[in-house]
């Protein structure tokens, strides 16, 4: 499960990349972890509507019996998610420059950073929801491709192709759901840094 990613670009560069209004987001680059804010791209869910970049806190408040914030959307038919997924205005793009998965046993873990060489800034398929104090976000996961699966065989984030950004932000759920699929391995790269966890 991906619980750390980097977005090493300032707000104005991200806004240009996603053809979005940067607003007053102060983001100047860095890492995003659960319960930390990160920029996401939203719209009002209608075709042709202007995209906006806004700060959101990573991690939905947990369900009644949960403890930790929910950062990844796995069961797309769960009542916990489906109400949000069906509303295009509550879907978002999560800008990323690389994301991390761990391998190895406790005490001997290695970090693996995944990126897209042809897209220095790419996007996860995300959703957002207004919580009591903060608007929050999470991103969808799917079966891993060959590259990610060699490190983390359970799941990988849903990475969107740029030509699918509008569909994710505006299409009805039946159409948007078809975008939930592993990103092609041949378009990705991985780097092992061997460093201890940042958190």
Predicted feature descriptions by range:
Residues 1-199:
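Short linear sequence motif anchored by a di-proline
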